[in-house]
Amino acid sequence: MSSNKILLTSSDGESFEIDEAVARKFLIIVHMMEDNCAGEAIPLENVTGDILSKIIEYAKMHVNEPSEEDEDEEAKKNLDSWDAKFMEKLDLETIFKIILAANYLNFEGLLGFASQTVADYIKDKTPEEVREIFNIENDFTPEEEEEIRKENAWTFNE
């Protein structure tokens, strides 16, 4: 049985022909198809080819993912292992780009997973370390910072 193919074009002009089942992981494309707005090629102006190829790779692995009710624990474990390896090979900047693209594509599974990866990465980091990771300038004076620490002492594990 042959599957319908969908042609996606990235913002930098790369074309990707994927199965419709994979494309249906992206709700923006589902809505385009339902509204008959999906022409010969679907342009994705906010996603580069490099990022789109990674997202498609992830979507292909998840096209037949077991549901929450599914009893196949081995399949779930294998997919979780693949997911972990997928994220491990990416740097933080690429994960940020994937989050933005997954949000644009409305690909909830990847958006949640990539966001959780970033959350896990910054967990147990000091405010200074988080500022460095995200390139955030500290606009508090030392006095203001001390006052905030006193007001919220219960949140700090010091």
Curated annotation (Swiss-Prot):
Residues 99-157 are annotated as: Interaction with the F-box domain of F-box proteins. Expressed in young seedlings, roots, leaves, floral stems, inflorescences, pollen, and siliques. Involved in ubiquitination and subsequent proteasomal degradation of target proteins. Together with CUL1, RBX1 and a F-box protein, it forms a SCF E3 ubiquitin ligase complex. The functional specificity of this complex depends on the type of F-box protein. In the SCF complex, it serves as an adapter that links the F-box protein to CUL1. This is SKP1-like protein 18. Part of a SCF (SKP1-cullin-F-box) protein ligase complex. Interacts with CPR1/CPR30, EBF1, SKP2A, At3g61590, At4g38940 and At5g49610. SUPFAM superfamilies: POZ domain, Skp1 dimerisation domain-like. Belongs to the SKP1 family. Gene3D superfamilies: Potassium Channel Kv1.1, Chain A (3.30.710.10). InterPro entries: SKP1 (IPR016897), SKP1-like (IPR001232), SKP1-like_dim_sf (IPR036296), SKP1/BTB/POZ_sf (IPR011333), Skp1_comp_dimer (IPR016072), Skp1_comp_POZ (IPR016073). Pathway: Protein modification; protein ubiquitination. GO terms for cellular component: nucleus; SCF ubiquitin ligase complex. It is found in: Nucleus. It comes from Arabidopsis thaliana (Mouse-ear cress). One of its GO terms (biological process) is auxin-activated signaling pathway. Keywords: Nucleus, Ubl conjugation pathway. Its main location: nucleus. Pfam families: Skp1, Skp1_POZ.
